[in-house]
Amino acid sequence: MNLLAIGAAIAALTGIGAGVGIGIATGKAVEAVSRQPEASGKIMQLLLLGGALAEATAIYGLLVAIMIIIFKP
């Protein structure tokens, strides 16, 4: 049972990576918009796409953690 809890915790750590990645991307997007305000529309589109992909990894990690806890392989 201990190893299952450790495995679930490691799978749930994907949320930390996603949070850091989204934070860095948002900071760079703000810098880019401050340099080129006319490109803000395109930058926001790319930021939303990148944020969605990064958040998907966190959701997959959460699902794996839940599956480890519930199904106990």
UniProtKB/Swiss-Prot annotation:
It holds the Pfam family ATP-synt_C. The chain crosses the membrane at residues 4-24, 51-71. F-type ATPases have 2 components, F(1) - the catalytic core - and F(0) - the membrane proton channel. F(1) has five subunits: alpha(3), beta(3), gamma(1), delta(1), epsilon(1). F(0) has three main subunits: a(1), b(2) and c(10-14). The alpha and beta chains form an alternating ring which encloses part of the gamma chain. F(1) is attached to F(0) by a central stalk formed by the gamma and epsilon chains, while a peripheral stalk is formed by the delta and b chains. This is ATP synthase subunit c. Belongs to the ATPase C chain family. Its main location: membrane. Keywords: ATP synthesis, Cell membrane, CF(0), Hydrogen ion transport, Ion transport, Lipid-binding, Membrane, Transmembrane, Transmembrane helix, Transport. It is found in: Cell membrane. The keyword Ribonucleoprotein does not apply. It is a multi-pass membrane protein. InterPro entries: ATP_synth_csu_bac/chlpt (IPR005953), ATP_synth_F0_csu (IPR000454), ATP_synth_F0_csu_DDCD_BS (IPR020537), ATPase_proteolipid_c-like_dom (IPR002379), F/V-ATP_Csub_sf (IPR035921). The keyword Transferase does not apply. GO terms for molecular function: lipid binding; proton-transporting ATP synthase activity, rotational mechanism. The record marks E55 as: Reversibly protonated during proton transport. GO terms for cellular component: plasma membrane; proton-transporting ATP synthase complex; proton-transporting two-sector ATPase complex, proton-transporting domain. F(1)F(0) ATP synthase produces ATP from ADP in the presence of a proton or sodium gradient. F-type ATPases consist of two structural domains, F(1) containing the extramembraneous catalytic core and F(0) containing the membrane proton channel, linked together by a central stalk and a peripheral stalk. During catalysis, ATP synthesis in the catalytic domain of F(1) is coupled via a rotary mechanism of the central stalk subunits to proton translocation.
